[in-house]
Protein backbone atom coordinates (compact mmCIF):
# COMPACT_ATOMS: atom_id res chain seq x y z
CA UNK A 1 0.00 0.00 0.00
CA UNK A 2 2.92 2.32 0.71
CA UNK A 3 4.17 1.90 -2.87
CA UNK A 4 0.73 2.81 -4.26
CA UNK A 5 0.47 5.90 -2.06
CA UNK A 6 3.93 7.08 -3.10
CA UNK A 7 3.22 6.35 -6.78
CA UNK A 8 0.09 8.52 -6.67
CA UNK A 9 1.97 11.28 -4.88
CA UNK A 10 4.87 11.18 -7.34
CA UNK A 11 2.39 11.31 -10.23
CA UNK A 12 0.81 14.42 -8.70
CA UNK A 13 4.24 16.01 -8.24
CA UNK A 14 5.25 15.30 -11.84
CA UNK A 15 1.95 16.45 -13.34
CA UNK A 16 2.03 19.67 -11.36
CA UNK A 17 5.69 20.35 -12.10
CA UNK A 18 5.27 19.76 -15.83
CA UNK A 19 2.18 21.97 -16.02
CA UNK A 20 3.84 24.74 -14.04
CA UNK A 21 6.82 24.44 -16.38
CA UNK A 22 4.68 24.87 -19.49
CA UNK A 23 3.04 28.02 -18.17
CA UNK A 24 6.39 29.28 -16.86
CA UNK A 25 7.84 28.88 -20.35
CA UNK A 26 4.99 30.93 -21.77
CA UNK A 27 5.57 33.64 -19.17
CA UNK A 28 9.33 34.04 -19.61
CA UNK A 29 9.87 33.30 -23.30
CA UNK A 30 6.90 32.73 -25.60
CA UNK A 31 4.79 35.73 -24.68
CA UNK A 32 7.68 38.21 -24.29
CA UNK A 33 8.88 37.19 -27.77
CA UNK A 34 5.42 37.56 -29.27
CA UNK A 35 5.05 40.91 -27.55
CA UNK A 36 7.85 42.14 -29.80
CA UNK A 37 6.05 40.87 -32.90
CA UNK A 38 3.44 42.57 -35.07
CA UNK A 39 -0.30 42.10 -34.54
CA UNK A 40 -0.79 39.48 -37.21
CA UNK A 41 2.11 37.35 -35.94
CA UNK A 42 0.86 37.09 -32.37
CA UNK A 43 -2.70 36.33 -33.48
CA UNK A 44 -1.58 33.72 -36.00
CA UNK A 45 0.94 32.03 -33.68
CA UNK A 46 -1.38 31.91 -30.66
CA UNK A 47 -4.22 30.49 -32.75
CA UNK A 48 -1.91 27.69 -33.87
CA UNK A 49 -0.50 27.07 -30.38
CA UNK A 50 -4.00 26.85 -28.91
CA UNK A 51 -4.79 24.06 -31.37
CA UNK A 52 -1.65 21.96 -30.95
CA UNK A 53 -1.49 22.33 -27.15
CA UNK A 54 -4.63 20.21 -26.82
CA UNK A 55 -2.78 16.90 -27.08
CA UNK A 56 -2.61 13.79 -24.86
CA UNK A 57 0.78 14.66 -23.35
CA UNK A 58 -0.31 18.07 -22.14
CA UNK A 59 -3.81 16.99 -21.11
CA UNK A 60 -2.51 14.10 -18.97
CA UNK A 61 -0.30 16.50 -17.04
CA UNK A 62 -2.85 19.33 -16.87
CA UNK A 63 -5.79 17.18 -15.78
CA UNK A 64 -3.44 15.10 -13.63
CA UNK A 65 -2.70 18.08 -11.39
CA UNK A 66 -6.18 17.59 -9.94
CA UNK A 67 -6.87 13.91 -10.68
CA UNK A 68 -3.61 12.58 -9.23
CA UNK A 69 -3.95 14.98 -6.31
CA UNK A 70 -7.37 13.59 -5.46
CA UNK A 71 -6.07 10.02 -5.76
CA UNK A 72 -3.11 10.79 -3.50
CA UNK A 73 -5.41 12.42 -0.94
CA UNK A 74 -7.78 9.43 -0.88
CA UNK A 75 -4.87 7.01 -0.42
CA UNK A 76 -3.56 9.07 2.50
CA UNK A 77 -6.79 9.14 4.48
CA UNK A 78 -6.24 7.90 8.01
CA UNK A 79 -4.75 9.20 11.25
CA UNK A 80 -1.29 7.81 10.56
CA UNK A 81 -1.04 9.83 7.32
CA UNK A 82 -2.58 13.04 8.60
CA UNK A 83 0.57 15.16 8.29
CA UNK A 84 1.07 14.16 4.65
CA UNK A 85 -2.63 14.59 3.90
CA UNK A 86 -2.53 18.22 5.05
CA UNK A 87 0.24 18.97 2.55
CA UNK A 88 -1.64 17.17 -0.23
CA UNK A 89 -4.88 18.99 0.56
CA UNK A 90 -3.17 22.40 0.37
CA UNK A 91 -1.52 21.50 -2.95
CA UNK A 92 -4.81 20.17 -4.31
CA UNK A 93 -6.58 23.40 -3.39
CA UNK A 94 -3.87 25.42 -5.17
CA UNK A 95 -4.10 23.22 -8.27
CA UNK A 96 -7.88 23.58 -8.33
CA UNK A 97 -7.50 27.37 -8.17
CA UNK A 98 -4.99 27.34 -11.05
CA UNK A 99 -7.23 24.97 -13.02
CA UNK A 100 -10.13 27.38 -12.49
CA UNK A 101 -8.04 30.30 -13.74
CA UNK A 102 -7.25 28.39 -16.92
CA UNK A 103 -10.83 27.24 -17.48
CA UNK A 104 -12.41 30.53 -16.47
CA UNK A 105 -10.09 33.02 -18.14
CA UNK A 106 -7.37 31.66 -20.46
CA UNK A 107 -9.59 29.19 -22.32
CA UNK A 108 -12.39 31.72 -23.00
CA UNK A 109 -9.75 34.17 -24.28
CA UNK A 110 -8.39 31.43 -26.55
CA UNK A 111 -11.91 30.74 -27.82
CA UNK A 112 -12.39 34.45 -28.43
CA UNK A 113 -9.16 34.55 -30.44
CA UNK A 114 -10.20 31.51 -32.48
CA UNK A 115 -13.57 33.12 -33.19
CA UNK A 116 -11.79 36.09 -34.77
CA UNK A 117 -11.11 33.81 -37.72
CA UNK A 118 -8.34 33.60 -40.28
CA UNK A 119 -5.73 36.30 -39.60
CA UNK A 120 -5.68 37.07 -43.31
CA UNK A 121 -9.36 38.03 -43.12
CA UNK A 122 -9.35 40.04 -39.86
CA UNK A 123 -10.08 43.71 -40.52
CA UNK A 124 -8.92 45.19 -37.19
CA UNK A 125 -5.98 43.06 -36.08
CA UNK A 126 -4.86 45.59 -33.47
CA UNK A 127 -8.22 45.38 -31.68
CA UNK A 128 -8.13 41.58 -31.65
CA UNK A 129 -4.66 41.67 -30.12
CA UNK A 130 -5.60 44.35 -27.58
CA UNK A 131 -8.59 42.30 -26.39
CA UNK A 132 -6.45 39.20 -25.96
CA UNK A 133 -2.76 39.64 -25.19
CA UNK A 134 -2.56 41.63 -21.95
CA UNK A 135 -5.36 39.71 -20.21
CA UNK A 136 -4.06 36.31 -21.33
CA UNK A 137 -0.53 37.11 -20.15
CA UNK A 138 -1.80 38.29 -16.77
CA UNK A 139 -3.84 35.15 -16.11
CA UNK A 140 -1.04 32.93 -17.37
CA UNK A 141 1.35 34.42 -14.82
CA UNK A 142 -1.22 33.84 -12.07
CA UNK A 143 -1.72 30.18 -12.95
CA UNK A 144 2.03 29.61 -13.38
CA UNK A 145 2.71 30.99 -9.90
CA UNK A 146 -0.12 29.01 -8.27
CA UNK A 147 0.88 25.73 -9.96
CA UNK A 148 4.49 26.34 -8.90
CA UNK A 149 3.40 26.83 -5.29
CA UNK A 150 1.38 23.61 -5.53
CA UNK A 151 4.46 21.81 -6.86
CA UNK A 152 6.55 22.99 -3.90
CA UNK A 153 3.86 21.94 -1.43
CA UNK A 154 3.64 18.50 -3.06
CA UNK A 155 7.40 18.14 -2.67
CA UNK A 156 6.80 18.83 1.02
CA UNK A 157 4.11 16.13 1.04
CA UNK A 158 6.52 13.66 -0.51
CA UNK A 159 9.11 14.46 2.16
CA UNK A 160 6.49 14.14 4.92
CA UNK A 161 5.40 10.77 3.54
CA UNK A 162 9.00 9.55 3.63
CA UNK A 163 9.45 10.74 7.21
CA UNK A 164 6.23 9.05 8.32
CA UNK A 165 7.21 5.79 6.64
CA UNK A 166 10.62 5.92 8.32
CA UNK A 167 9.01 6.41 11.73
CA UNK A 168 6.58 3.56 11.08
CA UNK A 169 9.41 1.21 10.12
CA UNK A 170 11.45 2.26 13.15
CA UNK A 171 8.48 1.64 15.45
CA UNK A 172 7.91 -1.76 13.85
CA UNK A 173 11.56 -2.69 14.34
CA UNK A 174 11.44 -1.62 17.99
CA UNK A 175 8.35 -3.74 18.61
CA UNK A 176 10.05 -6.68 16.95
CA UNK A 177 13.09 -6.35 19.19
CA UNK A 178 10.88 -6.10 22.29
CA UNK A 179 8.89 -9.16 21.29
CA UNK A 180 12.10 -11.11 20.66
CA UNK A 181 13.69 -10.08 23.97
CA UNK A 182 10.68 -10.88 26.15
CA UNK A 183 10.90 -14.71 25.93
CA UNK A 184 14.60 -14.60 26.76
CA UNK A 185 13.84 -12.58 29.86
CA UNK A 186 11.08 -14.95 30.89
CA UNK A 187 13.46 -17.88 30.59
CA UNK A 188 15.86 -16.52 33.22
CA UNK A 189 13.85 -17.60 36.33
CA UNK A 190 13.51 -21.12 34.93
CA UNK A 191 17.25 -21.32 34.41
CA UNK A 192 17.81 -20.13 37.97
CA UNK A 193 15.36 -22.73 39.31
CA UNK A 194 17.26 -25.56 37.61
CA UNK A 195 20.51 -24.50 39.32
CA UNK A 196 19.07 -25.00 42.80
Which stretches of residues belong to each language-model region?
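Interfacial segments of alpha-helical transmembrane regions
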Residues: 2-16, 74-97
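Juxtamembrane loop-transmembrane helix junctions in multi-pass integral membrane proteins
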Residues: 3-7, 45, 49-56, 78-86, ...
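Hydrophobic residues within the alpha-helical transmembrane core of Major Facilitator Superfamily
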Residues: 17, 70, 96, 152-155
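Interfacial loop at the N-terminal end of multi-pass membrane proteins
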Residues: 18-63, 108-134, 169-172
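Hydrophobic alpha-helical transmembrane segments
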Residues: 59-73
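Hydrophobic cores of alpha-helical transmembrane segments in multi-pass inner/ER membrane proteins
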Residues: 65-68, 146-153
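Mid-bilayer segments of alpha-helical transmembrane spans in multi-pass integral membrane proteins
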Residues: 96-104
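Intrinsically disordered terminal tails
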Residues: 162-196
Amino acid sequence: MFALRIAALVAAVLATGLTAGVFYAYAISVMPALNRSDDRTIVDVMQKINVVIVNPWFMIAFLGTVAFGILAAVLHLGREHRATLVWIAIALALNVIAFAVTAGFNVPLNDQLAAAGDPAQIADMAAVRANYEAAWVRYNVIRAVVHTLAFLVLCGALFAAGVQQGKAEAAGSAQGVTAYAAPAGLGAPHAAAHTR
